[in-house]
Structure formats: C-alpha cells, structure tokens
C-alpha cells in the first residue's frame, strides 16, 4: 500500500521537475499546433458545450478533441435519458449537433470517401442532423411556459422502436439502420 500512496503523492504533487527546457509540444502529430488542444473555461466563460456546427452550412470546421468529448457526453446523456423514457426533457437540436460533430470526426478519422460507400451515408446523416439542428435550435431554446415542447408527446418511443426494427432486419450492421435509429430518436 505504501508504494501506491507514494505514486499517488508523486503524481499529484505541486512540484514540477526542474528543467531548463521549454514545455514540450504535446501535439507533435498536428502541424502548427504549439498549445495543447484542451480548453479550460476562463472566469466568466460558460462551461456548457456549444456544438461545432453553426447555422451557416457553408462554414464548417472540424471539432477539437475537447469538443468531441463534450459531444460524446451529450449523446451519451441523451441515450441514458431515452432509456429512462425522459427524452421530452432533451434539447434535441443540441443532441443533433453533437451527433453530427461525432459523425464528421468519424468520417475524417476513417478517411471515408464522401462520394461512395459508407462515407456518402455518413455525409447524408451529418447533413440531416445539421439541418435538424438549425431548424429546431431556436424552437427548443425559446418559449417559456407549457407550449415550449410542442410535439413532445411520446418522444421516448422513437429509439426503442428503431432498435426493434434493427433487430428484425437481422442484426442491422448496415449504416442505414443507424440512420433510421437516429431519425427515430429525433421524432
């Protein structure tokens, strides 16, 4: 046990090793990066996730690692809420934007061709999610009172129904089944 506590103390101690070298570049694989890609909100800066996608479809920039992790957290929380049948409490536009960011990163990471194969389906799904995000972003954040969630009745049934369809189709290892599931979730 002493070895473990010594290692923990060493890991979390405030002392930094004495070195005259400048701090190393931890982003060696990314040309032009001299700073780490993590972002810690400053004083007065909001800590909520803002999806990378925006309302202008011509402007598209890749998500940073921190933004992708935040997007993954949003999607995971949405999946948990859907499993608890609480999807009426979700900001579906925010979830759509986060999902689109993850799909974009997957297509870039996998170097998938946007014109053929799975890449074209990823691109279509990403475009659909961005369109959903832009068309529903102002309606889900605006509106106070009981009419803020129009059409939210039975919102949790979309994902389980899509999952049942997926099971009926023989396992559903195709991307089309995932797109159907995402579309069913957004209803």
From Swiss-Prot:
Annotated signal sequence range: none
Chain positions covered by the region annotation Disordered: 1-66, 132-176
Function as written in the Swiss-Prot or TrEMBL entry: Prevents accumulation of abscisic acid (ABA) after heat treatment, thus reducing thermotolerance. May be a negative regulator of the ABA signaling/synthesis pathway. Required for defense responses against avirulent bacteria such as P.syringae pv. tomato DC3000 (avrRpt2).
Comp. bias intervals (Gly residues): 142-158
Assembly and interaction partners: Interacts with RPS2.
Gene: NRP1
Modification type N-acetylmethionine: residues: 1
Species of origin: Arabidopsis thaliana
Keyword annotations from UniProtKB, A to Z: Abscisic acid signaling pathway, Acetylation, Plant defense
Compositionally biased tracts (Basic and acidic residues): 7-48
Tissues where the protein occurs: Expressed in roots, leaves, flowers and siliques.
Family annotation (InterPro entries): Nodulin-rel_1/2
Induction note: Induced by P.syringae pv. tomato. Repressed by heat stress (42 degrees Celsius) but induced by low temperature (4 degrees Celsius). Slightly repressed by NaCl.
GO biological process, one term: defense response
Entry protein name: Nodulin-related protein 1
Gene Ontology cellular component list: cytosol; mitochondrion
Knockout-associated phenotype: No obvious phenotype under heat stress. Impaired resistance to avirulent bacteria P.syringae pv. tomato DC3000 (avrRpt2).
């Amino acid at each position: 046990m002493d070895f473990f506590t010594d290692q923990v103390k060493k890991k979390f101690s405030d002392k930094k090793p004495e070195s005259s070298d400048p701090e190393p570049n931890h982003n060696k694989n990314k040309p032009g990066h001299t700073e780490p890609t993590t972002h810690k909100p400053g004083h007065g800066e909001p800590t909520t996730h803002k999806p990378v996608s925006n309302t202008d479809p011509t402007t598209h920039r890749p998500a940073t690692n921190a933004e992708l992790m935040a997007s993954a957290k949003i999607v995971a929380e949405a999946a948990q809420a859907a499993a608890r049948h609480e999807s009426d409490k979700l900001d579906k536009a925010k979830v759509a934007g986060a999902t689109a960011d993850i799909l974009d990163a997957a297509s870039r990471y996998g170097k998938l061709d946007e014109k053929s194969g799975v890449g074209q389906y990823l691109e279509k799904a990403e475009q659909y999610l961005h369109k959903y995000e832009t068309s529903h972003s102002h309606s889900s954040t605006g509106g106070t009172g009981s009419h803020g969630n129009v059409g939210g009745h039975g919102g949790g049934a979309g994902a389980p129904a899509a999952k049942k369809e997926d099971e009926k189709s023989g396992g559903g290892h195709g991307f089309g089944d995932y797109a159907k599931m995402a579309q069913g979730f957004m209803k």
